[in-house]
């Protein structure tokens, strides 16, 4: 069985033969994951991740808090689902062909997934990455074979924003395929048809609330939309990091209040959280079905990551920690006896030089709180 990205992987045979077979195999790929016990390449190992009861949070809140262990996908994140859907859809539409280059703007995880799955299908991969991404992720992307372009963090109105750079790269190049994870609805579909249905089946329909952070919006939108359809009483909430405008969008209908706009448009999100928090309403996020939004701080995320490692042996990344902060806030809002689900979207392996580095934490004025209780969640 494939473990996360730290295992070896090879291309699925000769690339010429792959391209001839891609279109014929797409439907089979979507149906056969894990069914036979033998996977036809890495692309079939995506999904069907465990749902983990987080004991410490459950006991402290009086709710049942579960984490969907998406870090156990072969590429280490839920972006494997998105990459698979985007690639298979691109092949089906004839947009991906022999010699194509997949181009994307990514904070790392989508890039890892696109590179692994793209290489396994015989494609080149070029990634535009904001400069707040951890060195571990960039090194890994290059090791996996991606061409990386590191660009400064700037506001969405700046032509040098990493999303604009990726889009411009593809103009006029028929062999360049813009994955466009932010607005490509294959992202939403991957979670609506996959992750959400798995959660519903694993909980046997016993879900009172769902909470997660959003970047592209595909995970939150796909899961919240499906859960709301099967049970309109489910409470779906967003947890949003500093510098992101989605908290305001959900609660007030506008991305920013005027007093915040100039600062954020100039600097962009300042948070160390990778892959979550944006200042743009994406096509994927537009399909979300949310009841409200919480704000989560950097300090809460740091403390939660260390709390879960100490009490549950869960070695999680920043985005997963933020989601767990959201789970505690939602549990407090709904009250004891409820079942809350969130997404454990990344492991701590890609954060060893930052979130789990004493020197980095000290340099950035973070001090881990008393981890005997959840008082650090405000």
Curated annotation (Swiss-Prot):
UniProt modified residues of type N6-(pyridoxal phosphate)lysine: 79
Compositionally biased residues, Low complexity: 15-28
Start and end residues of each stretch annotated as Disordered: 10-31
EC numbers for this chain: 2.5.1.47
Cofactor list: pyridoxal 5'-phosphate
One Gene Ontology cellular component: cytoplasm
Keywords from the UniProt entry: Amino-acid biosynthesis, Cysteine biosynthesis, Pyridoxal phosphate, Transferase
GO MF term set: cysteine synthase activity
Pathway: Amino-acid biosynthesis; L-cysteine biosynthesis; L-cysteine from L-serine: step 2/2
Reactions it catalyzes: O-acetyl-L-serine + hydrogen sulfide = L-cysteine + acetate
GO BP annotation list: cysteine biosynthetic process; cysteine biosynthetic process from serine
Binding site for pyridoxal 5'-phosphate: 215-219, 319
SUPFAM superfamilies: Tryptophan synthase beta subunit-like PLP-dependent enzymes
PANTHER family tied to this protein: CYSTATHIONINE BETA-SYNTHASE
Family affiliation: Belongs to the cysteine synthase/cystathionine beta-synthase family.
Protein name per UniProt: Cysteine synthase
Source organism of the structure: Dictyostelium discoideum (Social amoeba)
């Amino acid at each position: 069985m494939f473990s996360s990205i730290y295992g070896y992987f090879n291309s699925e045979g000769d690339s010429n033969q792959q391209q001839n077979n891609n279109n014929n195999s797409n439907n089979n790929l979507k149906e056969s994951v894990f069914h036979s016990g033998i996977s036809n390449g890495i692309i079939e190992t995506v999904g069907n991740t465990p749902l983990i009861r987080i004991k410490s949070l459950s006991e402290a809140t009086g709710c049942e808090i579960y984490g969907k262990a998406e870090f156990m996908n072969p590429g280490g994140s839920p972006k494997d689902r998105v990459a698979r859907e985007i690639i298979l859809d691109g092949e089906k539409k004839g947009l991906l062909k022999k010699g194509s280059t997949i181009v994307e703007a990514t904070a790392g995880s989508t890039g890892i997934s696109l590179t692994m799955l793209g290489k396994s299908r015989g494609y080149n991969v070029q990634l535009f990455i904001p400069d707040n991404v951890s060195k571990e992720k960039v090194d890994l992307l290059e090791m996996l074979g991606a061409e990386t372009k590191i660009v400064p963090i700037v506001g969405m109105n700046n032509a040098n924003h990493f999303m604009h750079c990726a889009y411009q790269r593809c103009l006029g190049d028929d062999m360049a395929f813009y994955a466009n994870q932010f607005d490509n609805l294959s992202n939403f579909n991957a979670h609506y048809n996959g992750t959400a249905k798995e959660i519903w089946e694993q909980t046997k329909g016993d879900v009172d609330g769902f909470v997660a952070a959003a970047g592209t919006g595909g995970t939150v939108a796909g899961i919240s939309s499906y859960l709301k359809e099967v049970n309109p009483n489910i409470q779906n909430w967003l947890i949003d990091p500093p510098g992101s405008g989605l908290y305001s969008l959900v609660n007030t209908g506008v991305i920013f209040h005027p007093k915040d706009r100039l600062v954020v448009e100039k600097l962009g999100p300042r948070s160390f959280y990778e892959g979550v928090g944006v200042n743009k309403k994406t096509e994927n996020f537009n399909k979300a079905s949310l009841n409200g939004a919480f704000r989560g701080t950097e300090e809460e995320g740091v403390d939660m990551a260390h709390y879960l490692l100490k009490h549950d042996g869960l070695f999680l990344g920043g985005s997963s920690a933020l989601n767990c902060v959201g789970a505690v806030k939602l549990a407090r809002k709904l009250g004891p006896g409820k079942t809350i689900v969130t997404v454990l979207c990344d492991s701590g392996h890609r954060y060893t030089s930052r979130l789990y580095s004493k020197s980095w934490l000290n340099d950035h004025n973070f001090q881990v709180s008393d981890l005997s209780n959840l008082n650090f969640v405000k």
